[in-house]
Regions:
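Cytosolic-side transmembrane-helix boundaries in multi-pass membrane proteins
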Residues: 1-30, 36, 41, 235, ...
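Hydrophobic core segments of alpha-helical transmembrane domains in multi-pass membrane transport
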Residues: 24-40, 76-82, 103-109, 130-136, ...
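Single transmembrane alpha-helix segments in multi-pass membrane proteins
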Residues: 37-43, 49, 58-113, 127, ...
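Short, non-helical or kinked segments that cap or interrupt transmembrane helices
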Residues: 44-49, 86-104, 146-155, 229, ...
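Loop-to-transmembrane alpha-helix initiation sites
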Residues: 152-154, 203-209, 251, 284-285, ...
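Transmembrane helix-bundle core of multi-pass membrane transporters
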Residues: 152-223, 330, 361-363
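Helix-loop-helix "hairpin" substructures at the membrane interface of multi-pass membrane proteins
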Residues: 199-276, 300-301
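Transmembrane alpha-helical segments in multi-pass inner-membrane proteins
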Residues: 256-262, 266-336
Length: 363
């Protein structure tokens, strides 16, 4: 006898957006319930207090709220940068390095030219240098992929290590004071190369730039000819070639764009908010951006919400550790559970699971 499984799984058609949103909402609700149970069993703490602390850690004060939105803007900006490549099915895991190399280029301009040029001209040079550095870091793996079909995942990953070691080298070259192993605040006395504050807020410029970038990326991917070519290449390179699209050119152009956008985020990090350079200045957001982009299905508008979710969880994790005296890993456990449910909900959006009816037995 041939035994049939109890469940039948079939591919769904495209669901209306409100049904997809409802499935994701249910996934988050179930995740919070599971997190509450885990919290009670592992710590004995009231889960409501834990969730309240997470919210307070992200929005408890005006300053915390500004920091949350600044972190949201940086993560969203990097996520937007990797999205064109991902939509093309080019697995760019190198955003961390592309942002970091732009931070290095920005810091180099601030340190070497800070006392030699007017501030307006210096900032203009910094913008060009940061975008060019990020674009170069995106161009190299794209060129090798287009010409020799190299593995872009490994290539972009290795470029991260090169960027990290370059940054580490120049941090020692520029360290202040000598032997400190760090640069410190660049041009702290003169503020040369510091991007201007808006309404007295150093975070507001980053937020505004990323807001504009979100709209432009959405229009570019959805309504431009380049966006159409990216979508076609992502579906099938062979089909794209038959349609007269030059696949190699699209690959290189798209990765240069992704790298340039990462470069802009590197400029905003170094010259806009941190005013320094460290090997960890990007803080792993280049890798988190991969998750943000995938969870949002490469939709720049949806990325606002996925970025906000991850930033709130991250900010809340730090607050939990300090308020309850819990190991920071516990907050990571809660974050992992929530992300597991959210990612798992995509299965139920794309597939229908039903009980198989009892049929005739087959010999």
């Amino acid at each position: 006898m041939n035994k049939q499984s109890l469940f039948h799984i079939a591919k769904r058609g495209t669901l209306p957006w409100y049904i997809s949103a409802a499935i994701r909402g249910c996934a988050i609700l179930f995740a919070l319930i599971v997190c509450a149970l885990v919290t009670m069993f592992m710590t004995g703490e009231n889960p409501i207090s834990i969730y309240g602390t997470i919210f307070h850690g992200a929005f408890g004060t005006v300053r915390k709220t500004w920091v949350t939105f600044q972190n949201l803007a940086v993560l969203l900006g990097i996520s937007l940068a990797v999205t064109p490549a991902f939509k093309m099915r080019f697995w760019n895991i190198g955003a961390e390095g592309q942002v970091l190399i732009a931070c290095l280029a920005t810091a180099a301009c601030m340190i070497c030219l800070g006392d030699k040029l007017p501030n307006g001209l210096l900032i203009l040079i910094m913008i060009v240098a940061a975008i060019a550095a990020g674009a170069l870091w995106g161009f190299l793996p794209a060129f090798f992929k287009a010409r020799w079909n190299t593995n872009e995942t490994l290539f972009t990953l290795m470029m991260n290590y090169i960027a990290t070691q370059l940054a580490a080298y120049y941090i020692i070259v520029w360290e202040v004071p000598k032997g400190a192993g760090k640069i410190g605040i660049i041009n702290q006395n003169t503020n040369a190369g510091w991007l201007p504050q808006i309404a007295g807020k150093q975070y507001l410029l980053t937020i505004l730039v990323v807001a504009v970038l979100t709209v432009l990326t959405y229009i570019y991917l959805k309504y431009s000819k380049h966006g159409y070519e990216i979508a076609v290449v992502g579906e099938s390179q062979r089909t794209a070639s038959y349609a007269g699209i030059k696949v190699e050119r699209v690959i290189i152009r798209t990765m240069v764009l992704s790298g340039a956008m990462c470069g802009l985020m590197g400029l905003l990090l170094t010259a806009g908010t941190d005013h320094t350079l460290t090997t960890t200045i990007v803080g792993g957001r280049g890798f988190t951006a991969v998750m943000v982009s995938w969870m949002a299905k490469f939709n720049p508008i949806m990325m606002i919400f996925t970025s906000l979710l991850l930033v709130v969880l991250s900010r809340g994790a730090s607050e939990i550790s300090s308020v309850f005296g819990l190991n920071h890993s516990f907050a990571d456990i809660l974050t992992g559970i929530i992300l597991f449910f959210i990612i798992g909900s995509e299965f139920f959006i794309n597939y229908k699971v039903s009980l198989r009816k009892a049929g005739k037995k087959e010999a």
